């Protein structure tokens, strides 16, 4: 009996100590907005200077971070990274919306636990109200232990402390169609960022984003009020931030730009945790929030975490932050970026596609307007270059002077030293591992690229498993999607698909990127003879006379010869011109009828001359 009594006292004492320990831990509430750029009064924005009072109040009573950057410009990847505490490229969750099917599910490394799970194991009640969106398999019941019924009624949290919770806001996705007059923004008064056309359509896009932020600000006000009325504010740290930049601006969301990666980041709470009414100007990786959250809870930061405790006595400001862009729904890309105090370095790995390649926003008015302006020659040269121009291997911007990343300094010799330094920083970051260099499985490609609501994949990566009925090297689905005939057996290449500019043409004779602006191939004659090739064909010949027609222009006189893998098909001399000429080169029937597995075009001319090709087409004479 005495032994039982002693055991009971020990258990009571332990439970009391546990209660006391938990009571001293702060509650932590993340207010997590979708698709939101830092266009608030507290960030110096004039349009919203008096229209975001609740966010501004958080800043005045807490800490505002001026230069906070997410690890990726798309929701699922950023959310996967932050909840794990590590860049998604390290553990394979870098492709947007992975794990769509049983065959493509991604599992975290054995030891990894999600942030809420770690907190739950240390006595926290954890919840998530709204979107999760993680690119890997996870168990909701082991991660989130409490269901918040209403984001506007936090009273049920009073008896569920300490808690770690997330309240998800719609941010840029807020429906602003039926907005009250007090929240509306006149499109005529906004400033359209310099990397967009300044017309009524983009003025409306910018105005809508301001309105969306105002809606969120009202909701944040209600949340803060609930915290105060329930007494929770006395021991609750509140964090406001976003997963990436504005959703309806084409060079914000999904792009490795300042607009796509810089987000609002504000913390408020009890005095014990940070200095109130302070501003931080050091470069912040939003992965730091994961580490800082654990530090607030008094929990050791796991070995795989890349973030730092932002308020540690030993904290040292970062020299740089990195970011990555990979597949986004059906749109395949691979880009890496380094941001230092003054510069942003961008490394593009897939140069056969333009920046504005086919994507989920193609049917939006603003995307259609951009294409319309380009097609009709009404887009400025700088906007043509940004959205539809040849993809550069490297981009380098002084973002303190040029935050909209208009002027690429990568080829300016004055910046060679800085450029070399940023290359080295990228190498340093990549040395910790990047699974983006590994090709996606066919199963994953099929899950994302085939007739989904967001679009049809037109990148060359999808071609490896698709059927090509007529042997022209272009799959049936690709041809149908690009308004070609998949059964005509005709070689026809227009170079107007932004997701695969070269349409399979390649060359080993020139250092140039064959992919030119949307609608063109272009390359320099690095030597007097350059051959471009189209492999992967299965052409059976024809009973009628055939020819190749090529629309091109060049500053050099050229000798042009066409070959199949069985011999020469034809040749023609070209006289230099500054306008496109339609050339017709008759095909030698006997050679053509032997069938073709490849076609090559030999250009002979003055070294360093530029050649631009509008289309290559097989025709019947």
Where in this protein do the model-derived segments appear?
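Bacterial Sec-dependent N-terminal signal peptides
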Residues: 1-25
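Formylglycine-dependent sulfatase
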Residues: 21-389, 403-424, 438, 456-464
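Long, internal low-complexity/basic segments
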Residues: 24-26, 33, 37-38, 64, ...
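Hydrophobic residues on conserved beta-strands that form the core of alpha/beta folds
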Residues: 28, 65, 492, 582, ...
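Extracellular, beta-strand-rich glycan-interacting domains
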Residues: 399-401, 612-621
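Extracellular ligand-binding interfaces
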Residues: 523-590, 607-612, 618
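Noncatalytic modules at the cell exterior or secretory-pathway interfaces
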Residues: 590-601
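Short beta-strand-plus-loop segments that form exposed binding edges in beta-rich domains
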Residues: 600-608
């Amino acid at each position: 009996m005495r032994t039982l009594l002693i055991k009971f006292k020990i258990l009571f004492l332990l439970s009391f100590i546990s209660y006391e320990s938990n009571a001293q831990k702060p509650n932590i509430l993340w207010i997590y907005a979708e698709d939101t750029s830092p266009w608030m009064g507290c960030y110096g924005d004039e349009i919203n200077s008096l229209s975001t009072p609740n966010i501004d109040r958080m800043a005045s009573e807490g800490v505002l971070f001026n230069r906070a950057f997410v690890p990726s410009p798309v929701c699922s990847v950023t959310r996967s990274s932050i909840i794990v505490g590590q860049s998604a490229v390290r553990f394979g969750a870098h492709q947007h919306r992975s794990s769509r099917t049983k065959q493509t599910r991604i599992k975290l490394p054995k030891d990894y636990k999600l942030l809420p799970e770690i907190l739950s194991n240390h006595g926290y009640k954890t919840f998530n109200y709204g979107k999760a969106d993680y690119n890997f398999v996870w168990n909701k019941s082991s991660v989130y232990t409490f269901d918040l019924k209403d984001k506007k009624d936090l009273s049920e949290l009073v008896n569920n402390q300490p808690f770690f919770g997330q309240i998800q806001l719609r941010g840029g996705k807020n429906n602003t169609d039926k907005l009250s007059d007090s929240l509306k923004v006149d499109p005529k008064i906004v400033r359209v960022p310099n990397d967009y056309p300044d017309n009524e359509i983009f003025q409306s896009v910018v105005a809508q984003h301001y309105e969306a932020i105002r809606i969120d600000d009202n909701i944040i006000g209600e949340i803060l009020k609930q915290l105060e009325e329930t007494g929770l504010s006395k021991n609750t740290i509140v964090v406001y931030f976003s997963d990436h930049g504005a959703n309806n601006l084409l060079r914000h969301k999904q792009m490795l730009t300042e607009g796509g990666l810089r987000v609002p980041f504000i913390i408020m709470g009890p005095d014990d945790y940070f200095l109130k009414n302070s501003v931080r100007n050091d470069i912040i990786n939003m992965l730091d929030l994961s580490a800082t959250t654990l530090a607030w809870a008094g929990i050791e930061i796991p070995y795989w975490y890349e973030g730092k405790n932002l308020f540690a006595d030993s904290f040292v400001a970062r020299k740089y932050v990195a970011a990555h862009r990979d597949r986004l729904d059906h749109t395949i890309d691979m880009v890496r970026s380094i941001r230092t105090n003054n510069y942003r370095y961008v490394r593009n790995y897939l140069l056969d596609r333009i920046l504005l390649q086919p994507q989920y926003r193609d049917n939006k008015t603003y995307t259609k307007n951009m294409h319309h302006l380009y097609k009709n020659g009404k887009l400025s040269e700088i906007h043509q270059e940004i959205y539809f121009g040849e993809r550069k291997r490297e981009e380098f911007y002084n973002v303190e002077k040029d935050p909209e990343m208009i002027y690429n300094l990568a080829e300016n010799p004055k910046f060679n030293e800085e450029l070399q330094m940023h290359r080295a920083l990228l190498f340093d970051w990549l040395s910790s591992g990047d699974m983006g260099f590994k090709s996606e499985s066919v199963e994953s490609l099929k899950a994302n690229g085939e007739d989904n609501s967001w679009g049809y994949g037109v990148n060359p990566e999808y071609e490896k498993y698709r059927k090509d009925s007529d042997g022209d090297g272009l799959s049936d689905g690709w041809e149908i999607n690009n308004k070609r005939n998949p059964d005509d057996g005709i070689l026809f290449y227009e170079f107007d698909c932004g997701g695969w500019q070269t349409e399979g043409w390649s060359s080993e004779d020139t250092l140039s990127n064959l992919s030119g602006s949307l609608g063109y191939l272009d390359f320099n004659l690095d030597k007097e003879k350059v051959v471009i090739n189209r492999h992967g064909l299965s052409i059976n010949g024809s009973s009628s006379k055939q020819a190749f027609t090529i629309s091109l222009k060049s500053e050099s006189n050229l000798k042009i010869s066409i070959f199949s893998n069985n011999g020469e098909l034809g040749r023609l001399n070209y006289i230099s011109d500054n306008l496109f000429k339609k050339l017709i080169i008759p095909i030698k029937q006997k050679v053509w009828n032997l069938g073709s597995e490849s076609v090559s075009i030999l250009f002979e001319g003055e070294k360093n001359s530029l050649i631009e090709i509008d289309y290559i087409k097989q025709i019947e004479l």
